[in-house]
């Protein structure tokens, strides 16, 4: 009797669970580092590979997704190997090794010239999907290509149906923000692009999802405009979040694979979606590193370090010992509030420029998304500021200075949020040298060169042609002793002086 009952229960379980199918998406976004962060505690693509393999053991219909921003910026990518700048080769190599399936563009994929981006696309063993980003060649637009084959606007994933039922088909598209406009790129409207793709697929798919690289408000609008989307796997903000708009789930993990999302979609025998469960997984020391991927990561780190030595850096040299103090370079800090790391960089710029009234720069220049503590090396400074960049001495009217400050402070969460040194916020207004800013007075400021390009978010007006600019002094590139030629050397020099003075 007991044996019959057990057999009946087994059959019952099989009949219930055998009629469902599951599709899994493993999502990363904004991954700039291939190795673990915070002294090895978090992140690391060798650990992500371990998670991928574990999930695939239980479900072969597992797809690994990266929602944009990975080729750039990266500290390792700024180094040289085989007489060429690495330019993202290291991360494509490692992403190939972990078994990545699909990506869409992020705005930082366009940090490089077209030829470099094309090389990285061709190097990829995974597929790129984009509905709204096209190649622009003197006004003629057409798809980017991967080894001569046009990048698709969408892919249709096919999963076998239960028994003799038709297969389950999921349409997936990619959408990228137009935040880094380059002459070789054309951007179409996000929402109409997604609608166009859905109109092409609606009669041939069961479900529609998106890989996006938009700000969260745009993701929410996308969900409202295209309610057929069941899942939007997003990026760009660097901080994990989970939202629902109607029946659409929007999810973003933390940058640099500090966390990843695992989305499990369960369907019944009629291909009806029964459940969508999203699990945010911390990638930390408890997860073993895949040995083959770890070897590859270590090889690229060694190659990059040699390139840094050739540029005059000493990656392993200690600059300062913070002991138990911490410099917080996390995006949720540097892009939202004035912080010690921003103050330090501003102070170093102020010191290097000599004789200026204040210093300021865009928080997006800080890319480390990590906390620094203990012994800080030159490589840590490179990680903080992988773009490097020059320091300009800018003479500008007080009216323009106030506009810059107000623009920067009006966009917390953006790379255009400014960090500063020598500026004071009071109830009466902004002060420089203990006096309220006079709109008619001319001030001298140490300014990051990128901020003066007009390319930072909402700073299109800040160029050399602005009437509020009186004079711009650029560093002499032939003067190797001028720290203004590379803000990283300015920061290293400033920290070393501070450490020596305070150690006595």
What are these regions (language model features)?
Residues 10-18:
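Hydrophobic h-region of N-terminal signal peptides that target proteins for export
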Residues 19-22, 33-36, 49-51, 57, ...:
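Catalytic centers of hydrolytic enzymes
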Residues 1-2, 17:
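Intrinsically disordered, low-complexity sequence elements enriched in Ser/Thr/Gly/Pro
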Residues 19-288, 336-351, 359-361, 391, ...:
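Acidic, metal/ion-coordinating pockets
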Residues 2-8:
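Sec-dependent signal peptide recognition
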Residues 5, 181, 245, 328-329, ...:
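General secondary-structure edge motif
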